[in-house]
Regions:
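Conserved beta-strand-loop surface patch within small alpha/beta domains used
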Residues: 1-81, 90-166
Length: 166
């Protein structure tokens, strides 16, 4: 797998905070949700907000979205769901085989141009401390983020990430 050089995922400061709070609150399972934003004419994703979704499996190694929850969010943000995220609380540092199959199915077979963020654990901080640290402007512990997109012609590619400052 190669890193796609020309495209980026831009993540707003507010979206990043929501991602971090979600993965730390649900640190024992694969936290998951969708990314809200836009895709520009060059194929760059701009994540402006995050909408956490329930993982009905409550599993540290597997996630799925409840289809009704996903439909509700899609209706709430028409044409603005641009991707999905989930955590790997066990620290697995790349897309799993299941992740890869789902990325190919969504991006290539269904032709949905989502970007995929994986946030790697472990997430061993108390979420209430994270909120206090945010309020005091302290530095949050930053887990590693990986972004992917599965292109029809290039296969699975890692996408560069850029996080906006506050």
């Amino acid at each position: 797998m190669h890193k796609q050089a020309d495209t980026l995922v831009h993540v707003s400061a507010a979206a990043r905070k929501t991602l971090l709070l979600d993965v730390y609150k649900r640190r024992r399972i694969e936290a998951c949700g969708v990314l809200i934003g836009t895709i520009d004419e060059m194929g760059n994703w701009r994540v402006e907000a995050v909408h956490p979704l329930r993982n009905p499996f409550d599993s540290p190694v597997y996630f799925e979205f409840d289809p009704e929850d996903l439909l509700r969010v899609d209706l709430l943000y028409p044409e603005r769901v641009i991707g999905a995220y989930h955590s790997h609380p066990t620290g697995f540092a790349k897309a799993s085989g299941t992740d890869r199959k789902n990325m190919q199915r969504i991006n290539v077979e269904q032709r949905i141009p989502w970007v995929w963020l994986i946030i790697r654990g472990p997430f061993d901080r108390d979420p209430s401390l994270l909120q206090e640290e945010q309020a005091s402007q302290s530095i949050l512990p930053v887990p590693s983020f990986i972004a992917y997109h599965h292109y029809a012609d290039k296969g699975l590619q890692q996408i560069g990430l850029r996080f906006d400052e506050e």
